[in-house]
């Protein structure tokens, strides 16, 4: 008799994705982040669902409904902070996942990579809208500043902004639609994740050497399911430590003040995971130029398969490119720091130099380093 997990139409899909999936024997812990992102998504959907049961998307009651969740709802405080800090863990895993993709040349699976970029944009949109919902000062002014960027689009910009706002300023209509979109987007993300996995399982996973590993594969379960479980325990440990000991560490104190359109905070800034994008946006004094730089800083990832000049896939055996990769990481950390600083000397010039370096490394230095390495190896 055939095993049910290999014959049942539904269970067969799960079996081929998580149990009998042929996996390269040599993938490292950097490959854990995919499953950790799945875990983060589940945590966010569950905690978000319980929060939505008590939240009201009205400008008069939104702030007090979040306070009510923390004070009066059973375990509301932990659900709220798991959700808020879960977003930080989500982006931490997301950036590690993208970094691993760049380091080991996973972008050479273009379908998987491009769906990944769409996923990144969708998750960023979801997180931005979620930040608006508590209706604190930073929520309101963050929404005002970021949605206002659409007005930089020539000809249709102003109409587009008012269409997004649902009026002539960020108000009740904006909050209501942001709540509706914030609720639906994680389910769209889940659907995109399935497409992402579908394309990944068409080609199979990459591995640290960047070589074809068809001849040397092992089943995903129990080898990697156990390894992923360890990563999951560590993720939950860090999330709980953050939530229980310093839940507000990554938040902004201004968001504990109810939104007031008549009082602008001295320094408007997004959550930490958007700070490096925000620094790139601010580094160009022109509004349209800044918006273009912001969009290109994300869409530049789609060019990576075209910019790959090396005859080796991974950076494992390419010291020049390795150096550039870690300079890029340091540059992104610098941009994150700059994004949180006020717009004054010397932060302005540091931000501009770091932004130029970001684009230069990806568009110029990495492709040249690949060609030099080919030449040194006489390939």
Swiss-Prot record:
It is found in: Mitochondrion inner membrane. GO terms for biological process: mitochondrial electron transport, ubiquinol to cytochrome c. A ubiquinone binds at residue 201. GO terms for molecular function: metal ion binding; ubiquinol-cytochrome-c reductase activity. PROSITE patterns: CYTB_CTER, CYTB_NTER. Its cofactor is heme b. SUPFAM superfamilies: a domain/subunit of cytochrome bc1 complex (Ubiquinol-cytochrome c reductase), Transmembrane di-heme cytochromes. Heme b b566 binds at residues 97, 196. Binds 2 heme b groups non-covalently. Component of the ubiquinol-cytochrome c reductase complex (complex III or cytochrome b-c1 complex) that is part of the mitochondrial respiratory chain. The b-c1 complex mediates electron transfer from ubiquinol to cytochrome c. Contributes to the generation of a proton gradient across the mitochondrial membrane that is then used for ATP synthesis. This is Cytochrome b. The gene is MT-CYB.
């Amino acid at each position: 008799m055939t095993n049910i997990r290999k014959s049942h139409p539904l269970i067969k899909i799960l079996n081929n994705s998580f149990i009998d999936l042929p996996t390269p024997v040599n993938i490292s812990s950097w490959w854990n982040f995919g499953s950790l992102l799945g875990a983060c998504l589940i945590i966010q959907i569950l905690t978000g669902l319980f929060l939505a049961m008590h939240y009201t998307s009205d400008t008069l009651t939104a702030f007090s409904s979040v306070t009510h969740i923390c004070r009066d709802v059973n375990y509301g405080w932990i659900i709220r902070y798991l959700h808020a800090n879960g977003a930080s863990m989500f982006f931490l895993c997301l950036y590690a996942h993208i970094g691993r993709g760049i380091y080991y040349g996973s972008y050479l699976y273009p379908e998987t990579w491009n769906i990944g970029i769409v996923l990144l944009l969708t998750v960023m949109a979801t997180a931005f809208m979620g930040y608006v919902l508590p209706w604190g000062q930073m929520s309101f002014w963050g929404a005002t500043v970021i949605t206002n960027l659409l007005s930089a689009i020539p000809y249709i910009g102003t109409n587009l902004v008012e269409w997004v706002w649902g009026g002539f300023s960020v108000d009740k209509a904006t909050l209501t639609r942001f709540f509706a979109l914030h609720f639906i987007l994680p389910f769209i993300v889940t659907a995109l994740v399935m497409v992402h996995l579908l394309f990944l399982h068409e080609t199979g996973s990459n591995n640290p050497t960047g070589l074809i590993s068809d001849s040397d594969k092992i089943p995903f379960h129990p080898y990697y399911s156990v390894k992923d479980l360890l990563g999951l325990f560590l993720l939950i440990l860090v999330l709980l430590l953050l939530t229980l000991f310093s839940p507000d560490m990554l938040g902004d104190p201004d968001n504990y003040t109810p939104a007031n359109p008549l009082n602008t905070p001295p320094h408007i800034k997004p959550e930490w995971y958007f700070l490096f994008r925000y620094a790139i946006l601010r580094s160009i004094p022109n509004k349209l130029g800044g918006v273009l730089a912001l969009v290109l800083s994300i869409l530049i990832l789609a060019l990576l398969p075209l910019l790959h000049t090396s005859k080796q896939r991974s950076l494992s055996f390419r010291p020049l490119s390795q150096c550039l990769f870690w300079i890029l990481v340091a540059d992104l950390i610098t941009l994150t720091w700059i994004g949180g600083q006020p717009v004054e000397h010397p932060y302005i010039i540091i931000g501009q130099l770091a932004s130029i370096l970001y684009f230069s490394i990806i568009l110029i230095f990495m492709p040249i380093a690949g060609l030099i390495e080919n030449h040194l190896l006489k390939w």
